[in-house]
Design a protein with these regions (language model features):
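Active-site environment of non-heme Fe oxygenases that use a 2-His-1-carboxylate facial triad
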Residues: 1-49, 56-57, 61-83, 121-267, ...
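A gly/proline- and charged-residue-enriched helix-loop-helix capping module
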Residues: 88-134
Length: 329
């Protein structure tokens, strides 16, 4: 393992800008905006340097594929929950922070068949689910791009830390295909560009599906040309029936490990990941279930939603269930 621990990369908010962001965030949370335009005045009033850097990041030219914001307020918090409940901290300022960042990058969205379309996801350990490879677990979670099985994958995801783990060791691990590409052979690159891979639905999308988990249609893992390389990959669910392709997947996992950045998030840190450039994961930690366990909040942002998908949304910002759009893209 040759991971680099990231400590200073990104934007550090001044106290003045942090207070301003919290005021804007409280307003955003209270509005329950159905559209980005509902928050346009707040987005324009975000601290100018932060706003400019996020807009630059949204253009997709980043080599490392992530942007770190430090020094955000998180407000008063209840005990870390022992179960995942819809609407946790629904009007809390942290929901407003994530909404503003997601709407500046694109549009805050959820998925009808993931957590009933919840827009802000709680990431904390749940008793009895420690070994699940999703946001209720505490075991190591290997590299993946979010919702790899889905035709309308998020362009960005944000992870805001409310509480750190007790030992302060849990790291969000981020690895860019643009940094890993040089470690692959020409043959591996060619195979990874071939549509011979499939990705099973993650458990967060398949908890209520009987029988084997369904999979996506065949797809490539790498696409685009340097410097604009992109990736669609989940080390847990992306597979191929071809032996050569399977070896190329292992090579990609090893290359991502070589270039990994480990970001140990403290309260008030927000990491934004470009979901087409960088895969992310989590190191293991030990929960105590004492009300002070690690707690992150997650959001998705999509830069453009097809008009047909908008018309099929069950409610604003929530993308239609996969059974309704399978085969459309």
């Amino acid at each position: 393992m040759h991971a680099t621990t990231t400590t200073r990369r990104g934007h550090q908010l001044s106290e003045t800008d942090a207070r301003k962001m919290w005021t804007l965030a409280l307003s955003a949370a209270a509005r329950k905006a159905e559209n980005v335009s509902d928050l346009s005045d707040l987005l324009l009033n975000m601290p100018s340097e932060l706003r400019s850097e996020l807009i630059d990041f949204s253009a997709g030219a980043s080599r490392q594929g992530f942007f770190l914001i430090r020094g955000l307020p998180v407000g008063e918090l209840p005990a870390t929950p022992l179960e995942h409940r819809a609407g946790e901290l629904a009007e809390h300022g942290s929901a407003g922070l994530l909404t503003l960042v997601a709407d500046l990058l694109g549009t805050l969205v959820g998925y009808e068949d993931e957590k009933d379309g919840t827009l802000i996801h709680e990431v904390h350990p749940v008793p009895g689910e420690e070994h699940r490879i999703e946001n209720s677990g505490s075991v190591a979670f290997d590299f993946h791009t979010e919702n790899v099985h889905h035709p309308l994958r998020p362009d960005f995801l944000g992870l805001l830390c409310l509480r750190q783990d007790h030992e302060g060791v849990a790291a969000t691990r981020v690895a860019s295909v643009r940094e890993a590409y040089a470690l692959l052979t020409d043959g591996q690159r060619d195979v990874l560009r071939t549509p011979v891979f499939k990705s099973a639905y993650p458990t967060s999308f398949s908890r209520n599906i009987a029988g084997p988990r369904p999979s996506s249609g065949l797809h490539p893992v790498l696409f685009g040309q340097e410097p604009d390389l992109f990736m669609r990959f989940n080390s847990h669910t992306t597979t191929s029936d071809d032996a050569v392709a399977s070896r190329a997947l292992r090579a990609l996992s090893e290359a991502l490990e070589e270039v990994c950045h480990e970001v140990v998030l403290a309260p008030g840190d927000l990491v934004v990941v470009d979901n087409h450039i960088a895969a992310h994961g989590r190191s293991a930690f030990t929960p105590r279930f004492d009300g002070t366990d690690r707690w992150l909040r997650r959001c998705y942002s999509l830069r453009s939603t097809p008009r047909w998908a908008e018309r099929m949304m069950p409610r604003p910002r929530v993308l239609p269930a996969l059974m309704k759009i399978t085969g459309v893209l």
